[in-house]
Amino acid sequence: DRLRSRGLGDVYKRQMERTLNWLDRCAKAHGREEQMLFPIIQGNFFARLREESAKATIPYAKCGIAVGGLSVGEPASLMYEMLDVLQPLYPENMPRYLMGVGTPDYIIEGVLRGIDMFDCVLPTRIARNGTAMTSKGKVVVRNACYKEDFSPLDENCDCYCCKNFSKAYLRHLVNCNEIEAAMLLSIHNVNFLLKLTENIRTAIAEDRLGEFRENFYRDYYNKGVN
């Protein structure tokens, strides 16, 4: 059960309890050692329910813990508030997985709040719509300004797309509805997020995650950190 909007607390409590009942049945049925089972913390946007769900869910966690029901249209500040509630409760020796999150800012803010893993259709979905994520922000490739731009999507990227194709050629593919456009932009966008998480790991190891966050927001979103 993905809990999507604010409302009466008892309604969401029943939904959370239904999820916990399913988790118990799933754990009892799960017998494949080669398959990982990540129990999912729910609770809508109520701190009390999130805490209750976490405390009931964590005992089932053997290899990792997931957080669901966030990034479903709520303000970013509300998602961050729920992650702040959960951060002290996670097991320290297991990865934490935030479901359905794929924008660079959500990834960075999630890491700052104890998250290790993310998944999302975003990089391939926006690729199908002709949009690329770059070190200087989003590039809408179909725009006319790229008609005679023979530079790569991102001067700082070493992916197959950036090494071999220009913005002008990619724009041609997008505007002709060629499937290669979605393929090449997907390669680039996935590589961009892999490089982002690699850079985050390096910043953590060098104890400069705050500085990295500030610089990334300035370059990608053309704004400072709120």
Regions found by a protein language model. Give the residues of each.
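Structural signal for well-ordered, non-membrane alpha-helices
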Residues: 20-27, 87, 198-201
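Glycine-rich tight-turn/loop motif centered on a GG-T
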Residues: 10-17, 70-76
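Glycine- and acidic
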Residues: 10, 64-71, 179-182
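C-terminal extensions of enzymes
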Residues: 154-226
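Generic structural signal for well-ordered, non-membrane alpha-helical segments
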Residues: 16-19, 50, 79, 163, ...
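Single conserved hydrophobic/aromatic residue that forms the stacking wall/gate
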Residues: 1-12
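Acidic, His- and aromatic-enriched active-site or binding-groove loops in soluble protein domains
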Residues: 14-25, 59-66
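Glycine-rich phosphate/ribose-binding loops and adjacent secondary-structure elements
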Residues: 29-38, 42-153
